[in-house]
Amino acid sequence: MLFFIGAFPSIFVITERNEQVPPSGVPFLLTFIEIQMKNELLHFFVPEKGRRTKRQPISWLCCWAILLGIVCNACSDDDPVKKNPYLQVSTRALLKEVVEVKFNNIDGNTDITVDFGDGTVKEGKAANPITYAYTQSGDYTLHVTAGQYEVQKRIRIYNLLALTEAMKQFREPDNKKVWVMTHRAHTSDRTVPENSVSSVEDAIDSGAEVIECDTHVTSDGVVVVCHDQTINATTNGTGDITKMTYAELQKYNLKDRNGRVTDEKMPTLEEFLKAGRGRIYYNLDYSPRTATSQQVVDIVMKLDMMESVFFYCNSAQKAEEVLGITPKAHVYTWTGSHKPMMGLPGNYFVQYSYLTNGKSTPLGSSINDGMLATVNMLPASGSNVSEWTLNEGYLDELLQIYPMVCMIQTDLPDLLIPALQARGLR
């Protein structure tokens, strides 16, 4: 990346996740060229007394040519800057999330020392990442020494337990807590548009652990959050998301659940995730629908949110696809589609449904295979489950059918949570 200071460029390579160590020879060469350019520009535009103004600025042009060569080379596939040592580390993480610190493009035997900023110092070799899990939230500065290189990097630790750690509670024999997942970020407040940025705040305020949402992709490749593939039901416009550009989507406003038009726009997946980052978990339903798995995973990785997100997969094939991108993904499937997770380290949810078409999903083999049960308590054809009121009789029946339930998905988290508390399940 080039940053221009006045007319004279200097080169830095800095990204959110990687910090480039500048090559030792380049700054001196750039400084020399900059001085020469300043002198030549001065002579060219302000000629000395007695000097002809038509003098050709040969050395000035040479300086520009040299600089252009450096910049062009820096942008090529054989960029020497890319081959210099650089630090790779996340800038955000959750409590007890494993943070990896790695120096790339350096001799593997180089000694590495990492001061994590909380009193913890670890040493190792460049060949292997140095890992650490923070136990307290806050902003920290990492000080990393690798041979002759020294780099500092800021990292924010959110006050939310990483999913890998949080899911362990469901294996504890005395665990009594049932999590609540809010369907489309719904609560009993119908004035908040579903799957909107404001609905994220509403869901967090309700006390739910997880927000469920759906993803689609526009014709120009922007992943957005919406349940339907069309915008007909949720906005004051009409059209198929996959056939509209993101700019076209932004012409329309979201409607609340009473049908009134609001000031809110359909959010991108990135905006939706950022709105609750570090405060609540997300379940990306069908992971994805019209977006590709790679598109969705890339966004989650970019935001350093792999320990905050479930990838719901409606088939074993989709689960394999997501796990093929990253085996660290918290995949989450319909019951019977869980085979790709068997034998993997970690704990995984599978989903059942209460009273869909008048019936509840049989448990099948998922529980015997070590999966954790989540149950939908949602309106469906053939059932009287309401989106607007909580039927506690239905809740009691659900708990009887699925006594091992770990999480319930609902449109009414603010009503379900007190009902679970009254039953000793929070």
Predicted regions and their residues:
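Bacterial Sec-dependent N-terminal signal peptides
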Residues: M1-I11, F28-N84
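Compositionally biased, intrinsically disordered low-complexity regions
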Residues: F8, P27, L42, R52, ...
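Conserved NAD(P)+-binding/catalytic subdomain of aldehyde/semialdehyde dehydrogenases
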Residues: I14
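Cationic, low-complexity basic patches in intrinsically disordered or flexible, solvent-exposed regions
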Residues: Q20
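Phosphate-group recognition and catalysis centered on beta-loop-alpha active-site segments
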Residues: C75-K83, Y149-R426
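Extracellular/lumenal mature domains of secreted and surface-exposed proteins
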Residues: C75-V178
